[in-house]
Each structure stands twice: as C-alpha cells, then as structure tokens.
Amino acid sequence: EDVPACFFVTKTYIRDNPELATRMKVDGHQVGNHTVTHPSMPSVSYEELIQEITGCAEYMKEITGYDMDPYLRPPMGEYSQRTLKITQDLGYKTIFWSMAYMDYDVNNQPGASYVTAHFEKYHHNGAIILMHNVSSSNAEALETVIKNLKAEGYRFASLNEL
C-alpha cells in the first residue's frame, strides 16, 4: 500500500530478528530507538539511560549496517523532563502516539474486526498510530484499515514529514 512506517525496536528485537530489522531499512521505512532492555526511563540513572539509548543504536549499526533514525519512543510511554532532555542531547526526537490499543499481548488479541472498528472510530488528522508488530490482529486488519483511511482522503506520512 506504499505506506511509510517507523519501527521502534529494542536490542532484543534486533538480536532475534536481524533480517527483519535490516529489511525495514531496505524497504525504505524508518527504524527508531526503543532502548536496549525496555526499562521505565525515569527509573534508570543517567549513565544507564545513556547506555540504553546508545547501546541500541550501536547494536543496530553493528548487526544491520544501518543507522537508526533519530527518533525514540519511550518504553511504555514513561518519561520525565530529565529523560526528555537526555534524549534530546543525544540527538533524538521523542515520539509519542495519539492512537493505540492493547495489541502487545500475543496471547490476548482482539481480532481484526476490533482493530478495524477502533481505527474507524478514533482516527483523526495528524494521528501517530502505535501498532505493535507482534500483533496478529494488526497483521490481519492493516490492509483494510489503510484502504479505508485512504478512501476517506487521508495520506500517510513519515515522521520526517510531521
């Protein structure tokens, strides 16, 4: 459907899926930082946070040969003024989302019809949509959701365009 995406990945994801992490970049998508171990960022020390962010980026480069894009999504959306400043000082823009649902539990998926209805009800101009790539419901519904939103006149843009 020619829709850009930014995949926020952890070091563990890159380690377990090196081919997919590489393919994301090869296919023209953005790959953003989601830290090494997915901690609550406000709960870690300055030094630990630096390592969480730089360690993930360095591993991405080592394994795939590609640099991460300069975006970071805080694990669980947890942040503080301190973590926002550290992230900015490292050259990242912190990205949050405006649309999401509980799609990350692979053992409790709501189904494609729920996903489609959710997006039909809650979509809006400028939405940043959070979808976890482990979700079978997302995989089943994504083509329909994209076609429906395009039919309503929406255009999908990369984070660089926002």
Regions found by a protein language model. Name each.
Residues 30, 75, 124:
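Short glycine/serine/threonine-biased micro-segments
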Residues 39-64, 78-125, 138-141:
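Alpha-helical scaffold elements lining the catalytic groove of polysaccharide deacetylases
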